[in-house]
C-alpha cells in the first residue's frame, strides 16, 4: 500500500469516527468542587444555553477553543489519576454541556464503568433524548444545575 493510500485510508477512518471524538475544552486535575471527593473534571465544548452569567463562557460555542479527543485518551487520563480519587472521587463531565455530546460520551462512560471509576455529569438538563437517557443510566451521579423556572 502506498503512502497516499494510507493517507486516504486515515482520512476516511477519521471521517467515519468523527462522531466518536469528544470536543474537550480543558481539564482540571484534583478538583474538589465538581462532585464528591477528588475528581478529574473534563470541561466539554458546546452548550445549548447562552446564559449571561455563565461560569465558563468560553465553552459555549460548539466550535470554540477545543481539542477533538479520542475517548481512550480521556480514559487513560482517568485511570492514571484513579489512585488519587479514593473511595468518593472519580471523573466529572462539565462544560459547556455534556449532554450536547451524549452520543460520543456513551462509549467512554462504558469504559470508565469497566475501570470502576465513579462518573458524574454536571448538566443544565436542557437536552433530553434517547442518548441522554442512556448516558444518565451509565452515570453514578447527575448534578442538575437549574438555570431558570417559573
Each language-model region and where it sits:
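Conserved, mostly hydrophobic/aromatic
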Residues: 42, 51, 97, 121, ...
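Canonical Radical SAM [4Fe-4S] cluster-binding loop centered on the CxxxCxxC motif
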Residues: 26, 32-68
